Amino acid sequence: MSILIDNVSKNFGDFQAVADIRLEIQPGNLVALLGPSGCGKSTLLRLIAGLELPDSGQIWLEGQDATRQRLQERNIGFVFQHYALFKHLTVAQNIAFGLEVRKTPKAQIKARVEELLELVQLAGYGGRYPAQLSGGQRQRVALARALAVEPRVLLLDEPFGALDARVRKDLRAWLRRLHDEVHVTTIFVTHDPEEALEVSDTIVVMNKGRVEQVGSPVEIYDHPESAFVMSFLGQVNTLPNSPELFPQLSEAVREVLVRPHDLSLSVQAGGPALAARVERLMYLGWQVQAELVLEAGQPLIVQLSREQADRLQLRPDQPVYVQVRNPKIFPAVAADKQLAEAAA
């Protein structure tokens, strides 16, 4: 099902949670609403669900104005971060709940529950209670319950936020496979850039109630339209506006940002480079993170493979030279403000 958010705004008292957002979601897409706490992503999800009503603008579902429709009329499945399963009901009864409310024939309910238990890889668990399941299993039951009524849209509000890191990583790979099987238009809220990059077809980056950028994971990561987007999606370094490195920047009105993996090191001078000193080396499995200090005292982070670090024989206090690849250039005043927002 297609979704059109047409200039929607929502205020809570004096606080503007969503500010004049226009967003179009294609049928069958898996979309991540990504941003920091308080950016409006969960409010936008609740507006789509019908749990909140907009102060202005319209919400269109499959070409029909659904702005004032109730949740029950929109045929939307909603999964919360904390599962919200009925503790006194078995797994099968939890999944069947929505179908029973709709007075679906018992034979159909039984067949649908068995089908969904297979789909979410919980066949044989129908007779268990939520307390007998792990967190990851409970979240899969919640997803099965949402899918039971064959919703036109599936909405997930930070569905893996309450789980530990390993389970979260396993479940998001499973969610991607599940989506590829059922092809339901799905929107999920997350503050985790890695989760958004790994799972989604489209990422919507939000900040202060507004949409900063919409695009595929590759587009968002490789071609950020603002310093906020670039810094929220991973570590960045702010580089000095050096005429030797960036001769095209004639005025000191630009901010030059670069990711740690787009910097390379050498122990000998040669070509355009920044002189620096190794302050600390952090060994992170196959990767080494080198914390440097430039001549002007500015910190810099460089990510290297173990092989590269071993070949350079890096050590603390060693002088090195930093070459820059793929820098991104933004207006300085806006970039300073956005970097502070992304770090907040």
From Swiss-Prot:
Keywords: ATP-binding, Cell inner membrane, Cell membrane, Membrane, Nucleotide-binding, Sulfate transport, Translocase, Transport
PROSITE patterns, per database record: ABC_TRANSPORTER_1, ABC_TRANSPORTER_2, CYSA
Chain ranges of the ABC transporter domain: 3-233
GO molecular function, a single term: ABC-type thiosulfate transporter activity
Binding site for ATP: G35, P36, S37, G38, C39, G40, K41, S42
Reactions catalysed according to its record: sulfate(out) + ATP + H2O = sulfate(in) + ADP + phosphate + H(+); thiosulfate(out) + ATP + H2O = thiosulfate(in) + ADP + phosphate + H(+)
Entry's EC annotation: 7.3.2.3
Localization of this protein: Cell inner membrane
Entry-linked InterPro entries: AAA+_ATPase (IPR003593), ABC_SmlMolc_Importer (IPR050093), ABC_transporter-like_ATP-bd (IPR003439), ABC_transporter-like_CS (IPR017871), Mo/tungstate-bd_C_term_dom (IPR008995), P-loop_NTPase (IPR027417), Sulph_transpt1 (IPR005666), Transp-assoc_OB_typ2 (IPR013611)
Membrane topology: Peripheral membrane protein
Ranges annotated as spanning the membrane: none
GO terms classed as biological process: sulfate transmembrane transport
Gene Ontology cellular component terms for the protein in this record: ATP-binding cassette (ABC) transporter complex
Family: Belongs to the ABC transporter superfamily. Sulfate/tungstate importer (TC 3.A.1.6) family.
PANTHER family registered for this protein in UniProt: SPERMIDINE/PUTRESCINE IMPORT ATP-BINDING PROTEIN POTA, SPERMIDINE_PUTRESCINE IMPORT ATP-BINDING PROTEIN POTA
Cited function: Part of the ABC transporter complex CysAWTP involved in sulfate/thiosulfate import. Responsible for energy coupling to the transport system.
Subunit comment: The complex is composed of two ATP-binding proteins (CysA), two transmembrane proteins (CysT and CysW) and a solute-binding protein (CysP).
Name the UniProt record assigns to this protein: Sulfate/thiosulfate import ATP-binding protein CysA
Lineage: Bacteria, Bacillati, Cyanobacteriota, Cyanophyceae, Gloeobacterales
Gene name of the record: cysA
